[in-house]
Swiss-Prot record:
Transmembrane segments: none
Superkingdom of the organism of origin: Bacteria
The protein's name in its UniProt record: Cysteine desulfurase IscS
Record organism: Shewanella sediminis (strain HAW-EB3)
NCBIfam families: IscS, PRK02948.1, PRK14012.1
Gene Ontology, cellular component aspect: L-cysteine desulfurase complex
Length: 404
């Protein structure tokens, strides 16, 4: 067993060896290294064909038309292109956007930028289980609302939004609907034919593909128009200029094909491991799950261990590669904004750890993790005066702390 044990699959996944092998065939002189936009020779034609195959594979994953797939540098760029693209194209129809407080920073900061440009954004608060009720979204809709952006699976707590229901609502009100599916594409079934979603952001490195490549699904019927944010040679039907990175795209295509083929078996195995982990730690006193356990992705588990400081717990769990919050904001010492939006106080938010399980996690690793967590929590609470006071029945909320 290799240490530290990787339990941070929501931050990134290792490239599947089958994907890496396909990518290697698109790099060197004896491979498919040409520019897909070179139409005058075989090297370009071969690269274009490889890109077309990958585009089909990504489209098949979500049951889309290959012409609806726009390759980008990742889900962050896809989010930017979708939200800014819609806002700038449809601004004469209205300048109101609806999103949630628990979105990824790629959505929140894009909306903040649009606010600086004169758009108005409503940030919806979730219920304590992390989910946003349909009525809340409907109540926020106005005559001038042009876009709703709600994520499919939350990156920190793993809760799954009912995308089909939100899509129905948006379509009935003629409002464009964007979904950040970075955490769900390749892990949960997505069918754009039955879901009334207009734009979907996808990342390759969350589904065992390479970093630096993603896609944006842009619906053709009814047709969604976007204003480009990247200008140049007019690649990707004018929506995203820049030479297509054949090896990255081929990697994403192969990752999508494997994810589609293995989704059911992968998820069954991952769910068993997730349940094993939770059953192994839920007996620890004052341990709470964050987010709706039933309506969440099976590879994600966000747990608060009360009376234990998150940073010291992570240091104690040095044999486990886990995170407190998302990788994109883990450099800050602020408690997770997602957990704060759920109504957790600073202490509980700070004592939370995100465990995310994936394709290469083993039962042996989970058992080692359970043992390590139980021991570490015990050791840290031994040193905690707050834990001692709690054990003695002191109501810590009523304690008047002296200021020095």
């Amino acid at each position: 067993m290799k240490l530290p044990i990787y339990l941070d699959y929501a931050a990134t996944t290792p490239v599947d060896p089958r994907v890496a092998e396909k990518m290697m065939q698109c790099m060197t002189m004896d491979g498919i290294f040409g520019n897909p936009a070179s139409r005058s020779h075989r090297y370009g034609w071969q690269a274009e064909e490889a890109v077309d195959i990958a585009r089909n594979q990504v489209a098949e994953l979500i049951n889309a038309d290959p012409r609806e797939i726009v390759f980008t540098s990742g889900a962050t760029e896809s989010d930017n292109l979708a939200i800014k693209g819609v806002a700038h194209f449809y601004h004469k129809k209205g300048k109101h956007i609806i999103t949630s407080k628990t979105e990824h920073k790629a959505v929140l900061d894009t909306c903040r930028q649009l606010e600086r440009e004169g758009f108005e954004v409503t940030y919806l608060a979730p219920e304590s289980n992390g989910l946003i009720p349909l009525e809340t979204i409907e109540a926020a809709m106005r005559e001038d609302t042009i876009l709703v952006s709600i994520m499919h699976v939350n990156n920190e707590i793993g809760v799954i939004h009912d995308i089909s229901a939100i899509g129905e609502l948006c379509r009935s009100k003629k409002i464009i609907f964007h979904v950040d599916a970075a955490q769900s594409a390749g892990k949960l079934p997505i069918d754009v034919q039955s879901m009334k979603v207009d734009l979907i952001s996808i990342s390759a490195h969350k589904m065992y593909g390479p970093k630096g490549i993603g896609a944006l699904y842009v619906r053709r019927k009814p047709r969604i128009r976007l204003e480009a944010t990247m200008h140049g040679g007019g690649h990707e039907r004018g929506m995203r200029s820049g030479t297509l990175a054949t090896h990255q795209i081929v990697g994403m295509g192969e990752a999508a094909a494997i994810a589609k083929a293995d989704m059911t078996t992968d998820n069954a195995r991952i769910r068993t491991l997730r349940d094993r982990l939770w059953n192994g730690v839920k007996g620890i006193e004052e341990t709470y799950i964050n987010g709706d356990f039933e309506q969440s992705y099976c590879g994600s588990l966000n747990v608060s261990f009360n009376f234990v400081e998150g940073e010291s717990l992570m240091m104690a769990l040095k044999d486990l590669a886990v995170s407190s919050g998302s990788a994109c904001t883990s450099a800050s010492l602020e408690p997770s904004y997602v957990l704060r939006a759920l109504g957790l106080n600073d202490e509980m938010a700070h004592s939370s750890i995100r465990f995310s399980i994936g394709r290469f996690t083993t039962e042996e690793e989970i058992d080692h993790a359970i043992e390590t967590i139980n021991k570490s929590i015990g050791d840290l609470r031994e040193m905690s005066p707050l834990w001692e006071m709690f054990q003695d029945g002191v109501d810590l909320d009523k304690v008047q702390w002296a200021h020095h």
